[in-house]
Amino acid sequence: MENIEYLNEIQAVAGKLIHSYGVPVMITLFLRWLASIVAVFLMILDQTKWKYSNNIMASLLAPYLFSSLPIVIFQVLRNGVGKWIALLTVILRLFLPNHFHESLEIPGATILLIVVTPSDIGAIFRDDLRYTGGDVCLLTSFYLINKHTKACGGIKNSFTQKDKVTYSICLWILFVYPILSSFAALFYL
């Protein structure tokens, strides 16, 4: 019986959010979270043994994450936690290069990018996805999809070969997010 009460409360909260912000904003917010999770997943997947022979250039995911990371996570990384992680990254990289694993290069660079970027430049790339930030996300995701599709031998092969399906789905999610968020931006102009 308590489970039903929790579901009713969640439904009421979701209804209030949709009523106050609107459906396009909620869809954009959901897609922003999903795209960020997928970008982190691809970054992790690229450093594991499960990856296939096509290197997806995970370094391009750093600017994508910078411009599409949800504001809550971005502010946490930009303030206290991110500064400590960036400091540890720099110390390990400079003074203990043998102990700094190669798989930590791109995540460390992403955290450094988030922490070190000046507020004015960060606002240009983050606040409005219709302009610069959206362009970065769209161009990055388009390049990654194009490279992945060519390496697979076409769109059909990228979805039929079992070792490439995960990459294909994740890259298409990264591509759909900036397009749908720009369409959603038309509704609240």
Swiss-Prot record:
Ranges of the Cytoplasmic topological domain: 46-55, 101-104
Segments traversing the membrane: 25-45, 56-76, 80-100, 105-125, 169-189
Keyword field: Cell membrane, Membrane, Transmembrane, Transmembrane helix
Coiled coil: none
Membrane topology: Multi-pass membrane protein
Domain of life: Eukaryota
Subcellular location: Cell membrane
GO cellular component: plasma membrane
Extracellular compartment residues: 1-24, 77-79, 126-168
Family: Belongs to the Cold-regulated 413 protein family.
PANTHER family: COLD-REGULATED 413 PLASMA MEMBRANE PROTEIN 1-RELATED, COLD-REGULATED 413 PLASMA MEMBRANE PROTEIN 2
Name used for this protein in its record: Cold-regulated 413 plasma membrane protein 3
Lineage: Eukaryota, Viridiplantae, Streptophyta, Embryophyta, Tracheophyta
